[in-house]
């Protein structure tokens, strides 16, 4: 009988007096009794002492719990030797007594032993049936609310599905619109390209044959003149008899020489490169551009909003610095251009001259002489009847632009100038591998009461504002 008694003693020693189950994380109080850590924590729920031992009722001024690891091993051994039997439904797992009450604070079912333990002494504990009736009433109200929410959810789901379907149709319609519109634009561009090439060919056939004919005729006249000059030079070397002999024919031929000068051909081309809708498309890359007063030449006068500049009659007393242009009559845009695509427009009006473009941040701003001859400057210069660039490419102008659009594609090394009035291409620089920081450059060149003004763009056709 010793073995069963030993087994029983092991079970009793490994059982918590509060939950009546094997110890879980046992701790020892100052009086030497052991409890599960969670059990004693719930039993001593009050924030301040004194705290009473659940077994001997000894009082302690403060919580002082020491882990009991040997007891934890003993409880684990007892659990393996005598695993707890399955708890029947309606019976407390801790005390093996019928569940007869319900704790409203912890939402737990309680037996009589749970109530006697003192763990729930300050809680709202009610008989099982009363608690069940109250909970059933609450659940029925919750069900009513949930059913209403479910109705709303189904309605919202139907609306969302309908919206999704409508959006899908809208996207598909818009996709077809995009495809149709761009196909139309492609056809329009092809037709416009063919029309421009045809006009160029017609202009070439109209202008070049007379020019070639005139050049050939002048070549024949030059050859006849050269032959006559050679004859006269030879006759001048002859003695008197040879010089005067048959002179009548020679003099007649000299008198018959009549040089026909070539016809004056206008150098302005009637056909210009103009792509429909290009300027409107470029305005997608618009950005706010303002002038940097710290870079302005002392002769330049800037507006208060830093969007307009003109060349004044007097030189202002401004502090000199490496950032300031002098003697070049220039000013830079404040915004650095380091990547991406950028487009801005400048109202130049009927100015006699101007210069626009970009330059490197570190370009020499104290250069004397030809400012725009390369050296980190990419500038288009207008000089009354024609324009040139730092690449030394000259091109006459039939109708000087009143507003100039500048488009920079940094990564592509592309810089182009357009007439924003009609979209015609003014000039494109050869592809350039840009590096470092670029800044927009503005120069009125000549004095005029009319300023150059950076336009405010909204992106649509004709949305650029006129000068303020």
UniProtKB/Swiss-Prot annotation:
SUPFAM superfamilies linked: B-box zinc-binding domain (SSF57845), Concanavalin A-like lectins/glucanases (SSF49899), RING/U-box (SSF57850)
UniProt keyword Phosphoprotein present: yes
Coiled coil: 128-233
Superkingdom of origin: Eukaryota
Gene Ontology biological process terms in this record: host-mediated suppression of symbiont invasion; innate immune response; negative regulation of AIM2 inflammasome complex assembly; negative regulation of viral transcription; protein ubiquitination; regulation of gene expression; suppression of viral release by host
Localisation per UniProt entry: Cytoplasm; Nucleus
Posttranslational modification: Autoubiquitinated upon DNA stimulation; autoubiquitination promotes interaction with SQSTM1/p62 and recruitment of AIM2 to autophagosomes.
Zinc finger (B box-type): 87-128
Modified-residue entries (Phosphoserine), positions: 85
Record keywords: Antiviral defense, Coiled coil, Cytoplasm, Isopeptide bond, Metal-binding, Nucleus, Phosphoprotein, Transferase, Ubl conjugation, Ubl conjugation pathway, Zinc, Zinc-finger
Signal peptide (UniProt feature, chain positions): none
Binding site for Zn(2+): 92, 95, 114, 120
Main localization of the protein described in the UniProt heading: cytoplasm
Molecular function terms, GO-annotated: protein-macromolecule adaptor activity; ubiquitin protein ligase activity; ubiquitin-protein transferase activity; zinc ion binding
EC number of the protein: 2.3.2.27
Pfam families in alphabetical order: PRY, SPRY, zf-B_box, zf-C3HC4_4
Name of protein: E3 ubiquitin-protein ligase TRIM11
């Amino acid at each position: 009988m010793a073995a069963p008694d030993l087994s029983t003693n092991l079970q009793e020693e490994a059982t918590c007096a509060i939950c009546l189950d094997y110890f879980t994380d046992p701790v020892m109080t100052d009086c030497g009794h052991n409890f599960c850590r969670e059990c004693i924590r719930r039993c001593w729920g009050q924030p301040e002492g004194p705290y009473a031992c659940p077994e001997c009722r000894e009082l302690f001024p403060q919580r002082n719990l020491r882990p009991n690891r040997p007891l934890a091993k003993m409880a684990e051994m007892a659990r393996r030797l005598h695993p707890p039997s399955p708890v029947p439904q309606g019976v407390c797992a801790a005390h093996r007594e019928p569940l007869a009450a319900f704790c409203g604070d912890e939402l737990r079912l309680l037996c009589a032993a749970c109530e006697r333990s003192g763990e729930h002494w300050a809680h709202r504990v009610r008989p099982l049936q009363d608690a069940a009736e109250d909970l059933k009433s609450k659940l029925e109200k919750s069900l009513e609310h949930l059913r209403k929410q479910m109705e709303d959810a189904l309605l919202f789901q139907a609306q969302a599905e309908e919206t999704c379907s409508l959006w899908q149709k809208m996207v598909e319609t818009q996709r077809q619109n995009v495809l149709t519109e761009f196909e139309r634009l492609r056809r329009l561009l092809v037709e416009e390209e063919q029309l421009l090439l045809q006009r160029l060919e017609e202009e070439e056939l109209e202008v070049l044959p007379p020019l070639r004919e005139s050049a050939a005729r002048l070549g024949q006249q030059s050859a006849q003149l050269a032959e006559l000059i050679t004859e006269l030079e030879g006759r001048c070397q002859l003695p008197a008899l040879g010089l005067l002999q048959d002179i009548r024919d020679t003099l007649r031929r000299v008198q018959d020489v009549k040089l026909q000068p070539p016809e004056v051909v206008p150098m302005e081309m009637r056909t210009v490169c103009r792509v429909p809708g290009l300027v409107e498309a470029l305005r997608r890359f618009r950005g706010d551009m303002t002038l940097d007063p710290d870079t302005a030449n002392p002769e330049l006068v800037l507006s208060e909003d830093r969007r307009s500049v003109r060349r004044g009659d007097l030189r202002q007393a401004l502090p000199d610095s490496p950032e300031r242009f002098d003697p070049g009559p220039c000013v830079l845009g404040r915004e650095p251009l380091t990547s991406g695509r950028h487009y801005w427009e400048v109202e130049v009006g009927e100015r006699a001259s101007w210069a626009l473009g970009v330059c490197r941040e570190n370009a020499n701003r104290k250069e004397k002489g030809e400012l725009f001859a390369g050296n980190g400057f990419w500038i288009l210069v207008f000089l009354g009847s024609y324009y040139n660039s730092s690449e030394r490419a000259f091109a006459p102008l039939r109708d000087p632009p009143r507003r100039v659009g500048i488009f920079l594609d940094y990564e592509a090394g592309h810089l182009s100038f357009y007439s924003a009035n009609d979209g015609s291409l003014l000039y494109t620089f050869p592809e350039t591998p840009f590096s470092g920081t670029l800044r927009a450059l503005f120069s009125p060149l000549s004095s005029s009461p009319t300023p150059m003004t950076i336009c405010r763009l909204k992106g649509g056709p004709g949305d650029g504002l006129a000068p303020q």
